[in-house]
A protein has these predicted regions:
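Interhelical loop/hinge segments that connect adjacent transmembrane helices in multipass membrane
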Residues: 1-34, 74-91
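Alpha-helical transmembrane segments of polytopic membrane transporters and translocases
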Residues: 22, 37-40, 49-68, 98-102, ...
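Helix-terminus/linker motif at the lipid-water interface of multi-pass membrane proteins
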Residues: 31-62, 78-81, 116-126
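Helix-loop interface residues and adjacent transmembrane-helix termini in multi-pass membrane transporters
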Residues: 44-47, 83, 156-158, 184
């Protein structure tokens, strides 16, 4: 096949390295934030409460992973193809947000209503308190699903720094709200 000129290859590699570095920093921020939340919970509420949190977190991350993974597989390629047309990008974001909320809505409703049963099915009666934690996490997951189509726009635009900053800000807000909410809500 035709050879790609070296300057063009270098530009492509630079873009990939920049986005890759942004992903790594955002991933590190998420990991540190999750660790901080777990440390806060254990310090303030004890090991049993940390186990309850972890049980709810595992369930939440499993179902939200399916929803967001499917979104990325279908939506991201269409979005990157449309990035030069602002109206098309806007339409895609709106459509994807609506579709994601419609598809995830029944899962959210099921998790809100069936949280005690799901916890009992997957764990044991000792984890019953995790149902209330799972319900709070469902509310956060609704925000995730609603905001991810916009996050994909940042990625499709190649704005690695913006992605890194927004992800880091989101995890910082999560840690802060956990810290502020524990004395009030337990």
């Amino acid at each position: 096949g035709p050879r790609t000129p070296l300057p063009e290859l270098a530009a492509q590699w630079k873009t990939l390295a920049t986005l890759g570095a942004a992903f790594m920093v955002a991933g590190l921020a998420a990991t540190v934030g999750q660790l901080l939340v777990r440390v806060l919970i254990q310090h303030e509420l004890g090991t049993a409460a940390l186990g309850q949190f972890q049980a709810a977190w595992a369930i939440s991350m499993t179902y939200i992973g399916f929803v967001l993974g499917a979104m990325g597989t279908d939506y991201y390629p269409r979005l990157t193809a449309a990035m030069k047309d602002g109206a098309a990008v806007n339409r895609l974001v709106n459509e994807q947000t609506e579709v994601a909320l419609l598809l995830a809505g029944p899962v959210f409703i099921a998790m809100l209503g069936l949280a005690p049963w799901v916890i009992h099915l997957l764990y044991s009666r000792e984890f019953a308190e995790a149902a209330s934690v799972l319900r709070w996490q469902v509310l956060g997951d609704i925000l995730k699903v609603a905001s991810w189509p916009l996050g994909f726009v940042i990625l499709a635009a190649g704005a690695g720094r913006t992605f890194m900053l927004t992800e880091s800000l989101a995890i910082a807000v999560f840690v802060l709200l956990t810290w502020l909410g524990m004395p009030l809500l337990g």
